[in-house]
Amino acid sequence: MKFAIVANTERKEAVLLAKELTGWLDSKRVSYVLESLSAEKLGIGPSAKIDDLNRICDIFISLGGDGTLLLASHYSETKPVLGINVGHLGFLTEFNKDEMIGAVEKVLDGSYSIHNRTQLEATTMCNGREQRMCALNDVVIEKGTYPRIPTFVIRLDGELLGSYRADGIIIATSTGSTAYSMSAGGPIIAPKSSVFVITPICPHMLTVRPIVISDDKVIEVSVDAQAGEFPLNCDGRITRMLQPQETVTVKKSNDLINLVANEERDYCEILRTKLLWGREHASSQPE
């Protein structure tokens, strides 16, 4: 088995963990390859470009936050991703730094399980050709630098859902419901729910609300504006700039993201801790 290691080298703790992990793997004579930028900053090898890791490795290890895991999952395709959280509590990264070695040992002896997560697939036409992009968390169309409030036209399975004057539209998976969508007022959805949520960003009308739909729906979004370019983001990566009236088609991808599961992880506890639910009540309890 060969591991691909992707680390957020902007975080000192991730750097220390990467050195600890590679030292441990060396001591066990386990093969690994670091993503080239991580390897350069760490001064550790062997390394390869991130888009080559899927071809030469069996499983990815992400050292960082949810953003680092999203990056790793984008290149892992269907290969498992083991997420080690550094810093703030993550919704996607399943293990903390103290659990890292134990988690890797479980992978090596085959005693691990997988959480399958649904992805979005966004399709546009570019120079007469289809361009397809995938996202684990969300697909976002934003107003960008357009000086006015554009109108976003949304259709479900070809039927008009509505026209929203807003700063943007977020289409999120249940996994991504705790990311940008939540910040924009969208609901929190349990990770394995077979739904998507469409969340407007700063809508101009108070009656406009997020809507939860079945994940078998095909969503079409276009921007009704006279001019301008509108960023299309997949998991925070700007994939291209959309022209007025251009349509983006979003649906469930056929490919799943496979995350190495932490069976001791309590999702409800994560919500309470991350979102400070019940903190006032907890702090009032006698010691």
Swiss-Prot record:
It is an enzyme of class 2 (transferase). Its cofactor is a divalent metal cation. The keyword DNA-binding does not apply. NAD(+) binds at D66, G67, N137, D138, R148, R165, D167, T178, A179, Y180, S181, M182, S183. Its EC number is 2.7.1.23. GO terms for cellular component: cytoplasm. Its main location: cytoplasm. Involved in the regulation of the intracellular balance of NAD and NADP, and is a key enzyme in the biosynthesis of NADP. Catalyzes specifically the phosphorylation on 2'-hydroxyl of the adenosine moiety of NAD to yield NADP. Belongs to the NAD kinase family. This is NAD kinase. The gene is nadK.
